Amino acid sequence: MRVADFSFDLPDELIARFPKQDRTSSRLLSLDGPSGVVEHKVFSDLLELVNENDLLVFNNTRVIPARMFGQKASGGKVEVLVERVLDEHRVLAHVRASKSLKPGNEVILEGKAKATMVARHDTLFELEFEHSQNVLDILNDIGHMPLPPYIDRPDNEADRERYQTVYGEKPGAVAAPTAGLHFDDKLMTALKNKGVQMAFVTLHVGAGTFQPVRVATVDEHIMHSEYIEVPDDVVAAVANTKANGGRVIAIGTTSVRSLESAAKVHGGKLDTYFGDTDIFIYPGYQFNVVDAMITNFHLPESTLIMLVSAFAGQNNIMGAYNTAIEQQYRFFSYGDAMFLTRK
């Protein structure tokens, strides 16, 4: 299977660089996997697409202001993008500098925080901050929201709220689980009032989610690793939903990857799992847990467009993307959404 089979041409003006004023006013393209039928809706119409006893599984990670600018103690400019918080004082980070950091090198970030490079792990640098402050407090104080590279503008104060789900509560992501950006408190309440069940997994989205696939064939690609938590209350909620004839609806590819990973490590049967995952889902994958999903529109030739193609059918997805372009849908993190049922 060729990576080029997942390519499409996107006009630049369809890349959403700012969020819509109202979270639920985004457009929603509904694609039925078995039939390939497409319908055009708005996100608030989700209430009509879900049923009582369906289970929505959200990713409750919270985006940290992970990007910092500063200089090396020796004077050169440096940019730090935190990939993972290791503990109260240490992080793994991508570092851009004129000369690569060496163990013992110090950096001064935003003129306020001092960190020392203590080790290198492949392309990531382990940085240790001074112990007078918790690293999350430092990031909240001086960090910038890590907007994706295709949102080619500086972050602003509004991004601190809008590049964040309303239900995110566990800091650790360096990219938003973007399908969740369309939910507001009013919609969450309306869904609960309808009898829709809710459960929460955690996947701390890493910067690797934006890394391009650099191989020609899909099965050559090596997936990045991310930390997930699928607690036992989620396992119980899924079992109860299936027993009552409801659907498990994943909110975003991160929720899909979390649920399917927790099933994969247990031989295809969902069970509790806390740990790393590098699951790579592409056409041919047999889903064990998820029946439907909500997702944004993804980059061409990305692992995420491969995942949704595995879920709803590659021809269906590529056709729906062409339709979305014709209909002027907004693409990527701040863009519109899709509701997919499994083929």
From Swiss-Prot:
UniProt keyword terms in alphabetical order: Cytoplasm, Queuosine biosynthesis, S-adenosyl-L-methionine, Transferase
GO molecular function per UniProt: S-adenosylmethionine:tRNA ribosyltransferase-isomerase activity
Domain of life: Bacteria
InterPro entries: QueA, QueA_dom1, QueA_dom2, QueA_sf
A GO CC term assigned to this protein in UniProt: cytoplasm
EC number per UniProt: 2.4.99.17
Broad class of enzyme this protein falls into: transferase
Record's catalysed reaction(s): 7-aminomethyl-7-carbaguanosine(34) in tRNA + S-adenosyl-L-methionine = epoxyqueuosine(34) in tRNA + adenine + L-methionine + 2 H(+)
Pathway annotation: tRNA modification; tRNA-queuosine biosynthesis
Subcellular location: Cytoplasm
Biological process per Gene Ontology, one example term: tRNA wobble guanine modification
The UniProt record lists the keyword S-adenosyl-L-methionine: yes
HAMAP family recorded: QueA (MF_00113)
Function: Transfers and isomerizes the ribose moiety from AdoMet to the 7-aminomethyl group of 7-deazaguanine (preQ1-tRNA) to give epoxyqueuosine (oQ-tRNA).
PANTHER family associated with the record: S-ADENOSYLMETHIONINE:TRNA RIBOSYLTRANSFERASE-ISOMERASE
NCBIfam families: PRK00147.1, queA
Oligomer status and interactors: Monomer.
Family per similarity comment: Belongs to the QueA family.
Protein name per Swiss-Prot or TrEMBL: S-adenosylmethionine:tRNA ribosyltransferase-isomerase
Organism: Pseudoalteromonas translucida (strain TAC 125)
The gene coding this protein: queA
